[in-house]
């Protein structure tokens, strides 16, 4: 079920405050966050946000095409290494 329009998008307060402070100072610094559920809003464009994936913070440069998506969509948490090759010789 989608979020109600009257509520607006969810963005963590601490993250929004950091971005607004950087916009006022006209600075570009990497912002570290654990908030994967935060929605990308237009004020974030041009910033680099390091999103935690469970092991490390992955830096993500925010572009205009990412608006409306969640930060966690761009930091994969699982590492798929492919299916194991069936090796019949090693079974004998």
Swiss-Prot record:
GO cellular component: chloroplast; mitochondrial small ribosomal subunit
An annotated GO BP: ribosomal small subunit assembly
UniProt keyword terms in alphabetical order: Chloroplast, Plastid, Ribonucleoprotein, Ribosomal protein, RNA-binding, rRNA-binding
SUPFAM superfamilies linked: Ribosomal protein S19 (SSF54570)
Entry keyword Chloroplast: yes
Phosphoprotein recorded as keyword: no
Job description of the protein: Protein S19 forms a complex with S13 that binds strongly to the 16S ribosomal RNA.
Name this polypeptide is given: Small ribosomal subunit protein uS19c
Originating organism: Physcomitrium patens
Organism taxonomic ancestry: Eukaryota, Viridiplantae, Streptophyta, Embryophyta, Bryophyta
